[in-house]
A protein has these predicted regions:
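Bacterial N-terminal signal peptides that target proteins for export
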Residues: 1-9
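N-terminal signal peptide c-region/cleavage motif recognized by signal peptidases
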Residues: 15-16
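Periplasmic polypeptide-binding modules associated with outer-membrane biogenesis and secretion
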Residues: 22-38, 51-293, 297, 314-335, ...
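A short, conserved beta-to-alpha structural element at the edge of catalytic cores
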Residues: 136, 604-623
Length: 650
């Protein structure tokens, strides 16, 4: 153990004090201050006179016993910070604890009379580290891991931590069975230093032996072995085993992965290793739901089968009813059906293939759409933070939208039918379009924010995605165009800037979106391929898709060929489960390739969060800052919009 010659301890002793007396003795505490804020905090957190004052009242003799216990506890704290000649004094109503009359004085008091407790410190000189020695053969690189310097303050936590660092360094250098004893420290009172010695038995460098895998139920062992980052014969490194453990957990099919080494090497001098694996449930059923004042209510169910073939592949099916409840930007109930099948490690490690099918029907102010979609994509993970994907998509859809104002343009873009019945809220004629779209999506993602799940609550990091999709529209109308979108979000923990006291509880978040559709005019682009703004994904406070070019005179959205949008959001947690946010969104949509040519719209608002195990439950209220009213538009922007869902807005 870490100690010096003589009788003193360096570890904080915790225990419960004896309690005597029937009536609690009320008291208040004044504790002296040192020049070290960390030491002050530790002293206050260790003193039971302070920490138990309200939660565990005591009688007069219990108070004396608690104070005597604090003498030893606080002395141990001071020594652990390097003050080995320090003293602690505690008085109760100016009487020292060894005063024989103290107990009688307290018992004769009225039960309502508060007692004054004072804690004072005499730190004495600060001890420093003297010699730092290692008993045993240790490689220079491992010895450097101690990170101790002669002359530095003799802080116990630093010395104990150095022993742990030395052990880890040896085990990461092939010494699987390295042993580092607790450091031994000897005081030199004359020079006010502690001389520290570490006793080490490193043993021999050893390779990995047999690697056993246990606990599998549905998964095939061959899948796990292909994923392993370590193999028999590799030099033993503790960090490599930990990396292999984390990699297996990241596959999403294991709930727990533990790694153990045998207590002794095998007859060949190797280190046998066991991966103890617990699989996640193979079947998962979930329900989803959301509400916004512009899109109404959506409700759905999803089902996932993990490891269909025992190789980590997954099949996911989902079905949702959307636009329930008459949102202000919708005109009827729709549906969204989808299925996805994903195969990990396709052809090579860290490369997956995903096949998807879907069906969608929705009726929006901008257009009515009925579509069947399909796609296949190959996702390649280049590193921990970089990934790329390439794929092929095919879509067959029918879209109904108001007719372009120019009749010749209307015919040129494939307006095959003039719909007799106008859309609710407008008397303008509408066109029916039939599209067959083939796309080649290419995507690159940089992610240090850890946003693997859409419900993740990011607190720091950056995520940037660039998507380029050449698209071919077959038949009539025919078109070729390329849609490019750059999206990004950044998260800054204000505690790192010294603007908050607790990590992860005060976060400043930013979101940005830019997009261009090149190669086709505004109306030759299929309506669902154009850009729109407004709603929770772009500019809160405005109806879904309502920002951008619009038909005259009814003001229904047309969509544009360029977009830019951005958000600044402050997130603050309160207590254990609650939080609030404030935000400002801004953006515009253009009918040309100049993303800045449209009218900038801004929205602002606030919301509350309730944090659950699945993610934060979100309720946001936003207002348009430059609200449009007649005669600028036929239909005014609503005074506010409400958004409810699971997960942060981004």
């Amino acid at each position: 153990m870490f100690r010096r010659a003589g009788a003193y301890g360096l570890l904080i002793l915790l225990g419960s004090s004896a309690i005597w007396g029937a009536d609690p003795q009320p008291y208040r505490v004044e504790i002296g201050s040192t020049k070290d804020s960390a030491l002050n905090d530790t002293l206050k957190g260790t003193s039971e006179l302070i920490t138990l004052r309200k939660s565990a009242p005591v009688g007069p003799f219990g108070l004396i016993g608690r104070a005597r216990g604090d003498l030893e506890r606080l002395k141990a704290v001071l020594e652990s910070f390097g003050y080995y000649q320090s003293n602690v004094s505690i008085t109760i109503d100016t009487l020292p604890l060894d005063d024989p009359t103290l107990g009688d004085e307290l018992t004769q008091r009225s039960r309502d009379q508060e007692t004054q407790v004072n804690i004072a410190f005499n730190l004495g000189p600060l001890y420093h580290l003297g010699s730092i020695d290692i008993d045993g053969e240790v490689p220079p690189k491992a010895a450097a891991s101690l990170q101790l310097t002669s002359g530095a303050p003799a802080v116990a936590a630093d010395v104990v931590g150095a022993a742990e660092r030395l052990r880890k360094a040896l085990q990461d250098d092939g010494y699987a069975y390295a042993r580092v004893d607790p450091p031994h420290a000897r005081e030199n009172a004359a020079e006010r230093v502690l001389n520290v010695r570490f006793h080490v038995e490193a043993g021999e460098r050893r390779p990995l032996g047999d690697i056993r895998i246990q606990g599998l139920q549905n998964l095939k062992e061959s899948f796990v072995r292909r994923r392993l980052l370590v193999h028999s014969g590799d030099e033993y490194r503790a960090s490599a085993l930990e990396a292999a453990r984390r990699d297996l957990l990241a596959q999403g099919v294991f709930s727990q992965v533990n790694v153990h080494i045998d207590p002794a090497p095998d007859p060949q001098g190797r280190v046998p290793v066991t991966f103890d694996i617990h699989e996640r449930r193979p079947h998962v059923v979930g329900v989803t739901g959301a509400y916004s004042s512009d899109l109404g209510t959506s409700a759905g169910v999803n089902w996932t089968q993990r490891s269909v073939s025992g190789k980590g592949d997954a099949l996911s099916l989902s079905a949702s009813v959307i636009n329930l409840g008459g949102g202000t930007a919708t005109n009827g109930i729709g549906y969204d059906l989808s299925g996805k099948y994903r195969i990990p490690d396709w052809k090579t490690r860290d490369q997956s293939v995903q096949v998807s099918l879907g069906a969608l029907r929705q009726s929006l102010d901008a257009y009515d759409q009925t579509a069947v979609t399909s796609g296949v994509s190959v996702i390649r993970k280049l590193s921990r933070i970089w990934s790329v994907s390439a794929g092929f998509t095919a879509e067959r859809e029918k879209i109904v939208q108001e007719s372009p104002p120019d009749p010749q343009e209307s015919a040129a873009v494939g307006c095959t039918t003039q719909v007799a019945a106008p859309k609710p809220g407008t008397s303008e004629p509408r066109c029916t379009y039939h599209y067959t779209l083939l796309g080649l999506p290419l995507t690159a993602v940089y992610n240090t924010a850890g946003l693997e799940s859409p419900l993740a609550d990011a607190r720091k990091g950056l995520r940037v995605s660039l998507a380029v999709t050449p698209t071919f529209s077959l038949g009539h109308p025919s078109a070729k165009f390329v849609i490019t979108q750059l999206t990004g979000s950044a998260y800054f923990d204000l505690q790192h800037w010294g603007l908050a006291s607790d990590p992860g509880r005060s976060v400043l978040a930013f979101r940005a979106l830019g997009g261009l559709a090149a190669g086709a005019t505004q109306f030759s682009l299929p309506p669902d391929q154009r850009f729109y703004a407004g709603g929770s994904g772009t500019i809160r406070g405005y109806r879904y898709q309502s920002v951008g070019p619009a038909f005259i005179p009814d003001g229904n959205p047309i969509g544009g060929t360029a977009i830019n949008a951005g958000t600044v959001e402050f997130r603050q947690r309160i207590g254990t489960n609650l939080g609030f946010v404030t935000f400002v969104d801004a953006g515009n949509v253009s009918r040309t390739l100049n993303p800045l040519s449209g009218t900038l719209r801004m929205g602002a608002g606030a919301g509350v969060r309730y944090y659950t195990a699945l993610g934060p439950l979100r309720v946001d209220l936003a207002v348009p800052l430059n609200r449009r009213r007649p005669p600028e538009v036929q239909r005014a922007d609503d005074a506010f919009e409400v958004y409810i869902g699971l997960g942060q807005a981004f």
